[in-house]
Regions:
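Glycine-rich, basic loop-to-helix element that forms the pyrophosphate-binding segment
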Residues: 67-88
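Short, well-formed alpha-helical segments that are part of the catalytic scaffolds
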Residues: 17-31
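Short beta-strand-to-loop acidic/aromatic patch adjacent to the donor-nucleotide binding site
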Residues: 89-101
Length: 278
């Protein structure tokens, strides 16, 4: 493998957890089977010493560092990296949470090869595992009112059938997604009106509106530690998740799906109930 492979900018968003970010970078540098990449860390105005520590480590570990002046959320932070990648002619941007482990060392190579095989692929994601070894089902279908309310249980069963099937899907998981920069330039990156949660659905709509597709690469995977801890969320964390999810869902359902007020509220109420009983 050589620099003839498409160039990839790996973007890691940091907020307070510089230790996880450094560990993630070290894992990439020692395990990832891909030569033509750079790493960029965006610190989202952490309330601790993260920015100072990461800026120092950037020189020692050889990664790009950007200190954001405010914590404007997931989309804004990652857009800094995506736009840097576009401006500096990287062909792909790999959005990677710092609480992810590389289950397969060829995960990036495999996704890039899939992306190169089809010009209309704008976004790819691998299989996502939890710490107990179980895999998260892909989001194959575009959400409908039925799938977001009364039919949500049946939709989950249907999704589980495709865990091991590489295919076009509606959207992938935001903890690990490979973005084709040509497509991101066309759709103007992520919608920065979200803060946390729901960005993947909105990105899926932006890509589809320009006739790009999203691909689920089930043949390679990563482990997402947060997926394993969702059931242990504190009451305050659940309240925060509900609040931010509602903001994102309102934007998604109103401006991207054009649903009326009553339907939007029904969809959000169903989502809130699921979060509370988890």
């Amino acid at each position: 493998m050589s620099a003839s492979m498409p160039s990839v900018l790996i973007v890691i968003l940091n907020y307070g957890t510089y230790d996880l970010t450094i560990k993630m970078i070290q894992e990439i540098q020692t395990k990832l089977e891909y030569d033509n990449y750079s790493i960029m860390v965006v610190d989202n105005c952490s309330p601790n010493e993260s920015a100072e520590i990461l800026e120092k480590q950037s020189k020692e570990l050889g990664f790009l560092f950007y200190a954001n002046k405010s914590n404007a959320g997931y989309a804004v932070g990652n857009n800094i990296g995506i736009r840097y990648g576009i401006e500096n002619r990287y062909q792909y941007t790999w959005i990677l949470n710092n609480d992810v482990e590389l289950r397969d060392s060829n995960v990036l190579l495999h996704m890039v090869q899939k992306g190169e095989s089809n010009k209309k692929i704008g976004c790819l994601g691998p299989k996502i595992y939890t710490l107990d070894g179980s895999a998260c089902a892909p989001y194959c279908n575009r959400p409908t009112v039925w799938r977001m309310t009364l039919g949500i249980a049946q939709e989950r069963k249907n999704r589980a059938k495709y865990i091991d099937t590489p295919r076009e899907v509606y959207r992938v998981y935001g903890c690990c997604m490979l973005l084709k920069n040509e497509a991101m330039k066309v759709v103007d990156c992520m919608d920065e009106r979200t803060f946390l949660y729901g960005e993947e659905d909105i990105l899926a709509e932006r890509l589809a509106s320009k006739l790009y597709v999203t691909f689920y690469d089930s043949e390679v995977g990563v482990v997402h530690k947060e997926s394993s801890s969702m059931k242990r969320m504190s009451k305050n964390r659940k309240q925060m998740q509900i609040r931010e999810t509602n903001k994102s869902m309102e934007l998604y359902l109103k401006e991207y799906r054009h649903y009326p007020w009553l339907i939007r509220k029904a969809c959000m109420a169903t989502r809130n109930l699921i979060t509370l009983v988890r």
